[in-house]
Amino acid sequence: MGSARRALSVVPAVLLILVLPVWAQNDTEPIVLEGKCLVVCDSNPATDSKGSSSSPLGISVRAANSKVAFSAVRSTNHEPSEMSNKTRIIYFDQILVNVGNFFTLESVFVAPRKGIYSFSFHVIKVYQSQTIQVNLMLNGKPVISAFAGDKDVTREAATNGVLLYLDKEDKVYLKLEKGNLLGGWQYSTFSGFLVFPL
């Protein structure tokens, strides 16, 4: 009799373990990552400041909004005298990709979360006798630069790329330190994306 009671008390616990994953899988479709299946068990998890969440089962789950990418071009020449604010920020008037909308109309990328991000830029100088210098800025400080200064070449490119560790709300943009850019055929571009969140 005692063993029968013990067997009955175990049955509800076993049923709970078997039923809960089936219920959770109905709310969320599996996500395939490198040939393996990851099932998110909570369709409305509470997200912390790092973008991670914890389901009722105590499983830590990455938020699904980790897709971040932008790419923009400049369609006109860019001369510092034309910039009314005199910040020398390079503005890109045509946004080709802006997944997540984190690249602003002011041509500043604002990081939505902590992570490793990739940035690249390609700019062309306007005048043969001029040198251009472009800095990629992080929160107002230069991180990398690119130069183009061959006096015998009319259209010369300044190009660079970098991986950066960013915190949420960090701001990344391009600043023209010297010279003028050519943009009439979308020669100047600026792109970036989230490599992985932290």
UniProtKB/Swiss-Prot annotation:
| C1q domain span | 63-198
Q: Per the annotation, which location comes first and is thus the protein's main one?
A: secreted
Which GO CC terms are listed, alphabetically? extracellular region; extracellular space; GABA-ergic synapse; glutamatergic synapse; synaptic cleft
The record's annotation in Pfam families points to:
C1q
| SMART domains from the UniProt entry | C1Q
Disruption outcome: Mutant animals are fertile, have normal life spans and have no overt anatomical abnormalities. They have a normal corpus callosum, hippocampal commisure and pontine nucleus and no other gross neuroanatomical abnormalities. Mice exhibit increased anxiety-related behavior. Triple CBLN1, CBLN2 and CBLN4 knockout mice exhibit impairments in sensory processing and sensorimotor gating, in addition to severe motor deficits, seizures and reduced synapse density in the hippocampus of aging mice.
**Source organism superkingdom:** Eukaryota
InterPro entries, per the entry: C1q_dom, Cerebellin_Synaptic_Org, Tumour_necrosis_fac-like_dom
Q: Which residues are glycosylated?
A: 26, 85
Tissues expressing the protein: Expressed in brain with high levels in particular thalamic nuclei. In the thalamus, predominantly expressed in neurons within the parafascicular nucleus. Found in the hippocampus, mostly in the dendrites and somata of pyramidal neurons (at protein level). Very low or no expression in most other brain regions. Highly expressed in the ventral medial habenula.
Q: Which residues form the signal peptide?
A: 1-24
How is this chain modified after translation? Sialoglycoprotein.
What processes in GO biological process is this protein linked to?
A: inhibitory synapse assembly; protein secretion; trans-synaptic signaling, modulating synaptic transmission
Which keywords does this chain's UniProt record carry? Disulfide bond, Glycoprotein, Secreted, Sialic acid, Signal, Synapse
Q: Where in the cell is it found?
A: Secreted; Synapse
Q: What is the effect of changing residue 85 to Q?
A: No effect on its ability to form homohexameric or heteromeric complexes with other CBLN family members. Increased interaction with NRXN1, NRXN3 and DCC. Shows interaction with NEO1, GRID1 and GRID2. Total loss of N-glycosylation
Please describe the quaternary structure of this protein.
Homohexamer; disulfide-linked homotrimers. The trimers are assembled via the globular C1q domains. The trimers associate via N-terminal cysteine residues to form disulfide-linked hexamers. May form oligomers with CBLN1, CBLN2 and CBLN3 prior to secretion. Once secreted, does not interact with other CBLN family members. Strongly interacts with DCC in a NTN1-displaceable fashion. Weakly binds to NRXN1 and NRXN2 long and short isoforms produced by alternative promoter usage. Interaction with NRXN3 short isoform is hardly detectable; no interaction at all with NRXN3 long isoform.
Function, in words? Acts as a synaptic organizer in specific subsets of neurons in the brain. Essential for the formation and maintenance of inhibitory GABAergic synapses. Promotes the development of dendrite-targeting inhibitory GABAergic synapses made by somatostatin-positive interneurons. May contribute to the function of ventral medial habenula region of the brain implicated in the regulation of anxiety-related behaviors. May play a role in CBLN3 export from the endoplasmic reticulum and secretion.
Q: What is this protein called?
A: Cerebellin-4
In which organism is this protein found?
A: Mus musculus
Q: Gene for this protein?
A: Cbln4
